[in-house]
């Protein structure tokens, strides 16, 4: 009985997360039937469970079906925490060894991509880690085995190839970071780079 109860609890949590992040949502029913980001996460959970149990081909086929239906590609090997939300998710790509903590939010067009290292074999971590509470703006590309620290924000269209410490604002091409508190204070004062 624990399985179905846990499943219903997670679905409710996902819907509540979508409502909290999207002020345009009108109802839980609307989210349940019409939010592709939520559907992609649900499909990933099934594919990831199959992947972990060794049903790799079935998991990959399911992930490609999920991609076809939602426009969001999440490799079944990716590890994703709770309360993950993808807003307007078309074009999101999450690679095989990506790790996402709890309360992560991605906008459309985000790529969590790999960088192959010469001589690295199968199973080598080559995709980013996003710690808890990270938000990634539309079109951002985070590439390679790097870590974006807890509570950080990655700006739209940033190209990130280096680690960012917790509570950073990460912007630009190539991306630079600074403490999020400093960036927030500058914005309040009307100071721009």
Describe the residue ranges of each PLM region.
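Short glycine-enriched, charge-decorated loop/helix-capping segments at active-site entrances
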Residues: 46, 120-121
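Terminal amphipathic alpha-helical/low-complexity segments used for targeting or macromolecular assembly
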Residues: 1-70, 183-193
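Residue-level signal for alpha-helical context at structural boundaries
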Residues: 29, 33, 64-65, 98, ...
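Left-handed beta-helix
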Residues: 70, 75-76, 81-82, 87-96, ...
């Amino acid at each position: 009985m624990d399985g179905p109860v846990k499943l219903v609890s997670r679905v409710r949590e996902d819907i509540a997360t979508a409502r909290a992040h999207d002020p345009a949502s009108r109802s839980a029913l609307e989210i349940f039937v019409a939010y592709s980001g939520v559907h992609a996460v649900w499909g990933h959970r099934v594919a990831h469970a199959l992947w972990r149990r060794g049903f790799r081909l079935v998991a990959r086929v399911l992930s490609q079906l999920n991609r076809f239906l939602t426009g969001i590609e999440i490799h079944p090997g990716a590890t994703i925490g709770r309360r993950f939300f993808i807003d307007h998710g078309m074009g999101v790509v999450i690679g095989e060894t990506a790790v996402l903590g709890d309360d992560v939010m991605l906008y459309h067009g985000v790529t969590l991509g790999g960088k192959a290292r010469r001589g690295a074999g199968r199973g080598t971590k080559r995709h980013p880690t996003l710690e808890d509470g990270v938000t990634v703006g539309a079109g951002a590309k985070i590439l390679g085995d790097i870590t974006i620290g807890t509570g950080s924000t990655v700006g739209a269209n940033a190209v990130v190839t280096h680690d960012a410490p917790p509570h950073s604002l990460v912007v630009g091409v190539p991306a630079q970071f600074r403490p999020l508190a400093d960036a927030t204070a500058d914005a309040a004062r009307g100071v721009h780079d």
